[in-house]
């Protein structure tokens, strides 16, 4: 029976993905309009194929939009498949008294397995016996711990122990880095810890992004408004159904139904879906150039609206490369400590050593104490450094702590001046092991006494000039307890280790621990040759007997350092009103220290109620948890379930949550968050569950992405304002002509041309608007803030009403005021359907012949020119054209030129004149078009002035977050 394999769901069929693209209100409205237009075209008299232009164009747009949507679709299926990579392929199992290799998926609870260094754990297992002095597992992929974890067979009595504290359990998907052991399988398949992550990913229902939700709400509102207006227009004309001009009640009803459909086509921003997709796609290109690869288009905007970033610590805020920061030994007088600062935070074997700002060179030559420390670090070490010539980066093969010590040895150099001169001329890539090799050749290795959990140390036996020395490294509290002597000063005279010396060193260890540094003590035993246990030691107790009466040489303090640019990034997030919450599996002291260094906490800030461990958080009631997440900025010793819970709580408070991470353990929370941000060097599971991947693993890139996201949202509002005000203008135009009883000024094919081509090009160009100057000093938008707020709606209506009125007035002008026109009265124009009965002398054919087409051309040209001017207005929501001129966005300049060129094409190319039922304009008509269109700029400048005065509040009155005042921008 296949117990271990994780269940796989079948892939989503293509037809389902395509169908999903049509579950959008705007798309459904367009689909309905296309259907009605097609039916009306079938009943059109004559063989005029232009009747089918409307439905064909609409359907073409819908198909193109669906293709783009399916192409961009990213599902959890790939993430689930990637989880299989973290499942071991085979396992060594004891069955029927025989040891055999079987497929890991065939394991069942109760199987006894053997596992050793380099193996991937095939199932969740309970340790039975350890066949080596120590047994360590790298479980960062599951828990996020920056160091490998020592395991043992002792029982854990705490039933609520988190995974990090379950030291007798091996978790499926983690890797053994040291030792050999026997274990019994307890959980397989979906029941394992990694199986739980699989279950979390598959069970989650993807929530719509804030932008998608707002567009859906906007679509719902638009659907209702369009339906009401269309029905209203049809009903107010019921009395005209029997007018002689229509030739019967039924034909009159169909005629006004066509007008109602025209109204529907006019009201729907056909180009909106394509323009939004294009805008987001352009945003992804910009962000990719800045090392942020977006896997889901709507997430571009979503990141711009996030109010909380939940960040994993290890590998995200930190380098995930242990590095030594401090080198310490007692000074010559023994009343203080000599502290040497070490430069560099990666595994690159280069960096200066300094004391009080003064650079120190050839330390191993000038200081016997430092030389002895280098000897211990070089010999008590099984890690190796590696260099990738392609990326130019350095890495560690083995324990990260030992890798950090190896790097320090190379930074210190050898105890030979001539060797050092040659050594430091070499590039870092060629001196990965040069200094270490020097000490290894001087001190041949005789024996290794492996690390054990009980004595918290390891040692090596070396020889020099026929003398034998024991070099030891380990936890300071354990080493200090077993030391009898200590070296004083740089030249290292050995003196007894008194209580005063011991207390001085112990205080430094505590101080370093509070700062998040991991401290390693270095010691030696010089007169070891006479110890009878030297060649017979077999147990850790005997190893401990060897490691007695030691001489303490010094201490080293190391940490997984924060990335240098993270502090500035956190500062920018605060200025943007974004909370940064750190969620890590690491211990509290280390996490709090890192948080203080990067600015999440102040240097001396009281962390009461702001820092919780996973266990402390679990002990809270639901209401207390909700209160905790309002203030807390750090959660340490957490498990994957904590991350998902925190995302739920934050979202329930109305926050838009971004979650960063790089491990398998992060995947469920990455998927649940409004936007998941994975690291480029992270696991495939994390990357495939995320919406965005940071190729440079740089938390600071998120700040760039936030700014781009905010800019995209602002631009989205601008081109929606631009498109909708145009649509409102068209609706007002059709409604006014119908209400006034005038002939239709614009026909559906003209409206489609304006909506798709003439408007579409500038709308797309608005995506290139540069961000407003204060875009990163505004408070984040609230989750429930509508895309179209009250003020924005008023602006839509104000501009739209003018657009519609100007379009209708252009039609009226041609018939009533144009010196080259018929100059009939307005009453005659508004009663054209009674022309044959009441005033046939004017020539009723003018309402359907070339005169009508000329008037319609004036209306269409006014609409187009106003929209070009309106596009200029949309450069900024509140900044005047005088302060934010047109050439700030040259793409818009080109778009306006192209749109006008296309308009001239339909005006002056005969075939297109026929298609759009228009005629060329003369100079008199063009002057009228420009005069009627120009006031829209002045109107919008007044509205911008009002927004600056009334809706942009002074910063002191703005929202405050993390002690920073913000200037809110209102829609």
Swiss-Prot record:
It catalyses: Ca(2+)(in) + ATP + H2O = Ca(2+)(out) + ADP + phosphate + H(+). Its cofactor is Mg(2+). SUPFAM superfamilies: Calcium ATPase, transduction domain A, Calcium ATPase, transmembrane domain M, HAD-like, Metal cation-transporting ATPase, ATP-binding domain N. Gene3D superfamilies: Calcium-transporting ATPase, cytoplasmic domain N, Calcium-transporting ATPase, cytoplasmic transduction domain A, Calcium-transporting ATPase, transmembrane domain, HAD superfamily/HAD-like. One of its GO terms (cellular component) is endoplasmic reticulum membrane. PROSITE patterns: ATPASE_E1_E2. It is a multi-pass membrane protein. Ca(2+) 2 binds at residues 727, 730, 758-759, 867. The chain crosses the membrane at residues 26-46, 50-70, 218-238, 263-283, 719-741, 751-770, 796-816, 855-875, 892-912, 918-938. One of its GO terms (molecular function) is ATP hydrolysis activity. Its EC number is 7.2.2.10. It is found in: Endoplasmic reticulum membrane. Residues 47-49, 239-262, 742-750, 817-854, 913-917 are lumenal. One of its GO terms (biological process) is response to unfolded protein. Keywords: ATP-binding, Calcium, Calcium transport, Endoplasmic reticulum, Hydrolase, Ion transport, Magnesium, Membrane, Metal-binding, Nucleotide-binding, Translocase, Transmembrane, Transmembrane helix, Transport, Unfolded protein response, Virulence. It is an enzyme of class 7 (translocase). InterPro entries: ATPase_P-typ_cation-transptr_C, ATPase_P-typ_cation-transptr_N, ATPase_P-typ_cyto_dom_N, ATPase_P-typ_P_site, ATPase_P-typ_TM_dom_sf, ATPase_P-typ_transduc_dom_A_sf, HAD-like_sf, HAD_sf. Induction: Expression is induced by the unfolded protein response (UPR) during ER stress. Pfam families: Cation_ATPase, Cation_ATPase_C, Cation_ATPase_N, E1-E2_ATPase, Hydrolase. It comes from the Eukaryota. The active site is at 312 (4-aspartylphosphate intermediate). Residues 1-25, 71-217, 284-718, 771-795, 876-891, 939-971 are cytoplasmic. Ca(2+) 1 binds at residues 265-266, 268, 270, 755, 759. Magnesium-dependent enzyme catalyzes the hydrolysis of ATP coupled with the translocation of calcium from the cytosol to the endoplasmic reticulum lumen. Its activity is coupled to the unfolded protein response (UPR) and Ca(2+) import into the endoplasmioc reticulum is important for redox homeostasis, virulence, cell wall biosynthesis, and resistance to antifungal compounds that inhibit Ca2+ signaling. With pmrA, promotes radial growth and conidiation. This is Endoplasmic reticulum calcium ATPase srcA. It comes from Aspergillus fumigatus (strain ATCC MYA-4609 / CBS 101355 / FGSC A1100 / Af293) (Neosartorya fumigata).
């Amino acid at each position: 029976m296949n117990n271990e394999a994780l269940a796989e769901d079948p892939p989503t069929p293509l037809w389902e993905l395509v169908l999903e693209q049509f579950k959008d209100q705007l798309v459904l409205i367009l689909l309905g309009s296309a259907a009605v237009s097609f039916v009306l075209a079938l009943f059109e008299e004559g063989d005029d194929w232009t009747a089918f232009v409307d439905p064909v164009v609409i359907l073409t747009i819908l198909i193109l939009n669906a293709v783009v949507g399916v192409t961009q679709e990213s599902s959890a299926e790939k993430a689930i498949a990637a989880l299989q990579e973290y499942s071991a392929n085979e396992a060594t199992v004891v069955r029927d008294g025989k040891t055999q290799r079987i497929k890991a998926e065939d394991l069942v609870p109760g199987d006894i397995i053997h596992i050793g260094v380099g193996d991937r754990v095939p199932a969740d297992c309970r340790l039975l016996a350890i066949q080596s002095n120590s047994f360590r597992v790298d479980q960062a992929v599951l828990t996020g711990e920056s160091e490998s974890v020592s395991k043992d067979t002792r029982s854990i009595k705490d039933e609520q122990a988190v995974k990090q504290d379950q030291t007798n359990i091996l978790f499926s998907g983690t890797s053994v880095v040291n030792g050999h052991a026997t274990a019994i399988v307890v959980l397989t398949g979906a029941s394992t810890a990694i199986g739980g992550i699989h279950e979390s990913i598959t069970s989650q229902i993807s929530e719509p992004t804030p932008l998608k939700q707002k567009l859906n709400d906007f679509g719902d509102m638009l659907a209702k408004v369009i339906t009401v207006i269309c029905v209203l227009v049809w009903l107010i004309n019921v009395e005209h159904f029997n007018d002689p001009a229509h030739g019967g009640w039924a034909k009159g009803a169909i005629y006004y139904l066509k007008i109602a459909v025209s109204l529907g086509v006019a009201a729907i921003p056909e180009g909106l879906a394509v323009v939004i997709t294009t805008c987001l796609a352009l945003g992804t290109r910009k962000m990719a150039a800045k090392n942020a690869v977006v896997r889901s288009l709507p997430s571009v905007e979503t990141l711009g609206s996030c109010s909380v970033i939940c960040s994993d610590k290890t590998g995200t805020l930190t380098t995930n490369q242990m590095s030594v920061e401090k080198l310490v030994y007692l000074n010559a007088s023994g009343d203080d400590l000599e502290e040497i600062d070490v430069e560099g935070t990666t595994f690159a074997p280069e960096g200066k050593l300094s004391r009080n700002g003064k650079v120190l060179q050839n330390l191993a030559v000038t200081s016997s104490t430092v030389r002895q420390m280098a000897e211990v670090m070089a010999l008590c070490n099984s890690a190796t450094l590696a260099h990738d010539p392609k990326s130019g980066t350095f890495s560690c093969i083995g324990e990260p702590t030992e890798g950090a010590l190896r790097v320090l040895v190379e930074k210190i150099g050898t105890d030979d001046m001539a060797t050092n001169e040659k050594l430091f001329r070499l590039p870092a890539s060629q001196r990965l092991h040069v200094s270490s090799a020097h000490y290894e050749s001087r001190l041949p290795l005789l024996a290794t006494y492996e690390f054990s959990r009980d004595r918290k140390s390891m040692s090596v036996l070396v020889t020099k000039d026929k003398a034998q020395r024991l070099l030891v490294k380990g936890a300071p509290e354990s080493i200090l307890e077993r030391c009898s002597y200590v070296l004083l000063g740089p030249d290292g005279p050995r003196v007894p280790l008194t209580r005063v010396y011991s207390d001085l060193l112990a205080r430094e260890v505590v101080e370093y621990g509070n700062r998040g540094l991991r401290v390693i003590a270095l010691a030696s035993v010089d007169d070891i040759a006479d110890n009878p246990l030297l060649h017979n030691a077999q147990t850790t107790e005997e190893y401990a007997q060897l490691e007695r009466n030691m001489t303490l040489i010094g201490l080293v303090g190391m940490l997984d350092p924060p990335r240098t640019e993270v502090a500035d990034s956190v500062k920018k997030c605060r200025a943007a009103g974004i909370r940064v919450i750190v969620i890590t599996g690491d211990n509290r002291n280390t996490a709090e220290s890192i948080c203080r260094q990067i600015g999440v906490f102040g240097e001396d800030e009281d962390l009461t109620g702001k820092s919780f461990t996973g266990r402390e958080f679990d002990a809270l009631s639901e209401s207390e948890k909700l209160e905790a997440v309002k203030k807390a900025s750090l959660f340490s010793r957490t498990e994957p379930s904590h991350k998902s819970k925190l995302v739920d709580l934050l979202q329930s408070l109305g926050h838009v949550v971004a979650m960063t991470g790089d491990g398998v353990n992060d995947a469920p929370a990455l998927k649940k968050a409004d936007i998941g941000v994975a690291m480029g060097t992270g696991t495939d599971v994390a990357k495939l569950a995320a919406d965005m991947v940071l190729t440079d693993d740089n938390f600071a890139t998120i700040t760039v992405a936030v700014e781009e996201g905010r800019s995209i949202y602002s631009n989205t509002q601008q081109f929606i304002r631009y498109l909708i005000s145009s649509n409102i203008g068209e609706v007002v135009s059709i409604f006014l002509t119908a209400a006034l009883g005038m002939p239709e000024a614009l026909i559906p094919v003209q409206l489609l041309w304006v909506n798709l081509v003439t408007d579409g090009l500038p709308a797309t160009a608005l995506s290139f608007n540069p961000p407003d100057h204060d875009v990163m000093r505004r408070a984040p938008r609230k989750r429930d803030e509508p895309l179209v707020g009250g003020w924005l709606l008023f602006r839509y209506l104000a501009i739209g009403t003018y657009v519609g009125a100007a379009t209708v007035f252009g039609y009226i002008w041609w018939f009533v005021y144009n010196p080259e026109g018929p100059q009939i009265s307005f009453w005659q124009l508004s009663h054209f359907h009674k022309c044959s009965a009441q005033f046939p002398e004017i020539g009723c054919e003018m309402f359907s012949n070339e005169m009508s087409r000329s008037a319609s051309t004036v209306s269409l040209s006014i609409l187009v020119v106003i929209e070009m001017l309106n596009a200029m207005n949309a450069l900024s929501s509140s900044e005047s054209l005088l302060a934010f001129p047109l050439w700030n966005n040259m793409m818009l300049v080109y778009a306006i030129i192209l749109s006008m060129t296309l308009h001239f094409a339909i005006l002056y190319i005969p075939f297109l004149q026929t298609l759009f039922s228009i005629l060329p304009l003369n100079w008199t008509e063009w002057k009228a078009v420009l005069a009627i269109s120009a006031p829209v700029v002045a109107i919008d400048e007044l509205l911008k002035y009002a927004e600056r005065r009334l809706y942009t509040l002074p910063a002191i009155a703005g929202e405050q977050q993390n002690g920073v005042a913000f200037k809110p921008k209102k829609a």
